[in-house]
């Protein structure tokens, strides 16, 4: 069978690499892909942009694609799944209406309130004055979010009132995030530990993936601006079996039932970004309608189930008949980024030192890379993800940093403490 994966990041390289392990899969087309997917056995890049819905549909028809997996959020919010359904093509992802869970933060907060799903107290604003009055009344720290999609960067955690006021003015007057910031959500600052809780949903049944923890801030010890993610590890020890059960009962099931009850049944990967507070109460910070990036990379390293079979079961509404199996080892992925990221950065720098042979339990997934005249060059802010398995998070971390050490280009940087919370827990034991 032929498979299509939509996207060009590290997440799509990891999904493609995993899908290629299915013996019945002949070719996995990646649209548009990157230098890593171009080199991966069974994978082939196709020059179609993720926003080109008509082009993707035409290609899937032409190649008789039997499964399409959507990586990024943009095509979901544009309705790629609806278009494939109309053409009678099998695709795993939420419809345009269901993708509002990620596409609009205001929609999500109102949805959570309607279904009594735990989240931070909040208010939505389109005008500057009432928004400023609200933050002055609430005080800092407080969180200001652009309503629409802002590539994971439209969230300002304001530690002072001045920062909050500046963020509101930027988003509502200066329009720092374009269309995404024409409405803001202001919410209480939650204290606790974050976890990424990703599940597969077929409309009613839910299959949990491995837990993970992402590192959003650009700098060590969680300093500097938010990014799309600088590294992740799996499993996340903060999600104990008891908390796992609470998340399923208090967050995931009510979300899936609520979406179905409102006429937007949810099919696809559903990612709940959670804050686990001191007494183990999970609160929803955000939803993503897709697998996380970079969480996908360490999670796929641990996945022992067949990803293609799971996606096909979900499309057939049979997720209750399959199970997910995981390598008991820990996995960690470290993002290698271009100097300047998440602000302006260089493109076109030649990358050297990429591993020539695959070693069990180690993998460099490509994100912002392209082939130029026989060289692999940088083509994005997050360029590569050095990923490794280990018997503990500290062992996985050591292997991943050893792998990262061999790779270089002008201006490359990475965080040096990915996994620090889990490692602190291991050391306490």
From Swiss-Prot:
Give the EC class as a word. Answer: ligase
Q: Which Gene3D superfamilies match?
A: 3.40.50.20, ATP-grasp fold, A domain, ATP-grasp fold, B domain, Phosphoribosylglycinamide synthetase, C-terminal domain
Q: Which superkingdom heads the taxonomic lineage of this protein's source?
A: Bacteria
- What are the GO MF terms of this UniProt record? ATP binding; metal ion binding; phosphoribosylamine-glycine ligase activity
Co-factor: note: Binds 1 Mg(2+) or Mn(2+) ion per subunit.
> Which pathway, per its entry?
Purine metabolism; IMP biosynthesis via de novo pathway; N(1)-(5-phospho-D-ribosyl)glycinamide from 5-phospho-alpha-D-ribose 1-diphosphate: step 2/2
Enzyme Commission (EC) number:
6.3.4.13
One Gene Ontology term from the biological process aspect of the record: purine nucleobase biosynthetic process
Residues forming the ATP-grasp domain are 109-316
Biased-composition ranges for Basic and acidic residues?
A: 213-223
Q: Which residues bind Mg(2+)?
A: 286, 288
Q: Region Disordered: list its residue ranges.
A: 212-234
| Entry keyword set | ATP-binding, Ligase, Magnesium, Manganese, Metal-binding, Nucleotide-binding, Purine biosynthesis
Instruction: List required co-factors.
Output: Mg(2+); Mn(2+)
The record's section on SUPFAM superfamilies has: Glutathione synthetase ATP-binding domain-like, PreATP-grasp domain, Rudiment single hybrid motif
Q: What's this protein's family per the entry?
A: Belongs to the GARS family.
**NCBIfam families in the record, alphabetically?**
purD
This protein's name:
Phosphoribosylamine--glycine ligase
């Amino acid at each position: 069978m032929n498979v299509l994966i939509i996207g060009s990041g590290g997440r799509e390289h990891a999904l493609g690499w995993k899908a290629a392990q299915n013996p019945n899969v002949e070719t996995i087309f990646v649209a548009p892909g990157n230098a890593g997917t171009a080199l991966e056995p069974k994978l082939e890049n196709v020059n179609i942009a993720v926003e080109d819905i008509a082009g993707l549909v035409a290609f899937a028809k032409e190649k008789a694609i039997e499964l399409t997996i959507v990586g990024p959020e943009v095509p979901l919010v544009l309705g790629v799944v609806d278009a494939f359904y109309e053409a009678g093509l099998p695709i795993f992802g939420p419809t345009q209406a269901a993708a509002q869970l990620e596409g609009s933060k205001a929609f999500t907060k109102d949805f959570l309130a309607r279904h009594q799903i735990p989240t931070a107290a909040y208010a939505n604003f389109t005008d500057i004055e009432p928004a400023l009055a609200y933050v002055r009344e609430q005080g800092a720290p407080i969180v200001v979010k652009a309503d629409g999609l802002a590539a994971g960067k439209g969230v300002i955690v304001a530690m002072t009132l001045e920062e909050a006021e500046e963020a509101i003015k930027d988003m509502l007057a200066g329009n720092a995030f374009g269309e995404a910031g024409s409405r803001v959500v202001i919410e209480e600052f939650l204290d606790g530990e974050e976890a990424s809780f990703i599940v597969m949903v077929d409309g009613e049944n839910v299959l949990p993936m491995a837990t993970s923890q992402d590192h959003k801030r650009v700098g060590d010890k969680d300093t500097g601006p938010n990014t799309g993610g600088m590294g992740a590890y799996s499993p996340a020890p903060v999600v104990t079996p008891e908390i796992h059960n609470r998340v399923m009962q208090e967050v995931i099931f009510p979300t899936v039932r609520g979406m179905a009850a409102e006429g937007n049944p949810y099919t696809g990967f559903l990612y709940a970004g959670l804050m686990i507070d001191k007494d183990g109460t999970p609160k929803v910070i955000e939803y993503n309608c897709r697998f996380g990036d970079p969480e996908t990379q360490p999670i796929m390293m641990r996945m022992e189930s067949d990803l293609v079979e799971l996606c096909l079961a979900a499309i057939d509404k049979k997720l209750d008949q399959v199970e997910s199996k995981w390598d008991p080892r820990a996995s960690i992925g470290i993002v290698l980024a271009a100097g300047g990221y998440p602000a302006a950065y260089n493109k076109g720098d030649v990358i050297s030192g990429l591993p020539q042979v695959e070693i069990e339990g180690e993998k460099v997934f490509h994100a912002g890379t392209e082939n130029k005249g026989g060289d692999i060059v940088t083509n994005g802010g997050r360029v590569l993800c050095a990923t490794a398995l280990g018997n503990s998070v500290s062992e996985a971390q050591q292997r991943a940093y050893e792998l990262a050490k061999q790779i270089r280009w002008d201006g490359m940087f990475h965080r040096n403490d990915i996994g620090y919370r889990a490692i602190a827990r291991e050391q306490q034991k």
